[in-house]
Regions:
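A metal-dependent hydrolase metal-coordination microenvironment
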Residues: 38-267
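Hydrophobic secretory-pathway targeting helix
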Residues: 7-38
Length: 268
């Protein structure tokens, strides 16, 4: 869940304006201590707010200022974590590829995003600002360019992640086309070792001068294959092996909740 300091911070901000009411309720509790009652506080909040870190037009400061003027208690930001789609040519799909990319938090810098939210949260007393991102955990391709029916599926299935406040956690979100990660090396290492071994054999053959007209092209081929299959992928799922069901989404949910975040479906 969202870390306790955020909750305490929210209550602190709320009580600045409503402290007298809470004192009255406390007095009532003292008068009738045996009567158990729950105190519910209704707050006004907005979620999935985009800034100029991704597809929004306004800065975090401008949005916080607007929220405070309109007496909004909580703003949960939802900028796109990574807004990138790739299609590559097999067997070198991670090297020779076409990339379609839009502005995103990880493109502009997660550290700046978090720092700006925290700084403005300190400046605006009434409104609590909570960092959050909209994520695209998975998509997959069908068809081909040759047949003119190439289609990206599940691109519109998005999850909202609220409450992470670590730059490293944002950068290690299990998203396609994202940052290098050591999290999935154990799942991807076998292919890398096998291909890397074959590459080293071809290097040895070239060094010894065996059939260089054949072994040099083979060495270059396996050099590219080794690079293409490195084990430091940002996600264990790629878009070239069809629908993976709910696994990519559950993988992101498990990662985010392990970091103390809340996760919600945004688009399905």
């Amino acid at each position: 869940m969202i870390r306790l300091q955020s909750i305490f911070h929210s209550i602190k901000k709320f009580t600045l304006g409503y402290g007298s009411g809470l004192v009255l309720l406390g007095a009532l509790g003292a008068i009738a201590p045996s009567t158990a009652f729950a105190l519910y506080i209704q707050i006004d909040g907005v979620a999935d707010i985009k800034t100029n870190f991704s597809e929004g037009c306004s800065s975090i400061k401008d949005l916080a200022s607007q929220a405070e003027r309109q007496k909004i208690d909580v703003v949960l930001f939802g900028d796109l974590a990574r807004n990138s789609m790739e299609f590559g040519i097999k067997p070198f799909e991670r090297i020779f590829k076409n990339i379609t990319q839009g502005p995103s938090v990880l493109d502009r810098g997660a550290s700046g995003f978090i720092a700006e939210i925290k700084e403005n949260d300190r400046q605006f007393e009434r409104t609590l600002l909570i960092p959050g991102v909209e994520t695209i955990p998975f998509y997959f391709w069908s068809g081909s360019n040759y047949d003119k029916n190439l289609t990206a599926h599940n691109w519109d299935k998005h999850l909202l992640v609220f409450g992470m406040d670590s730059t490293e956690d944002f950068e290690q979100l299990p998203l396609p086309n994202s940052n290098f990660s050591k999290k999935y090396t154990h799942e991807l290492l076998n292919n890398f070792i096998i291909i890397g071994f074959i590459f080293m054999v071809t290097v040895g053959a070239v060094y010894k001068g065996y059939f260089r007209k054949f072994t040099v092209p083979l060495m270059l081929f396996f050099a590219l294959m080794t690079l293409n299959n490195h084990p430091f992928q940002s996600s264990p799922f790629d878009p070239y092996h069809g629908d993976q069901g709910m696994e990519p989404y559950q993988n992101l949910i498990d990662f985010a909740t392990s970091k103390g975040a809340l996760v919600f479906w945004n688009h399905m």
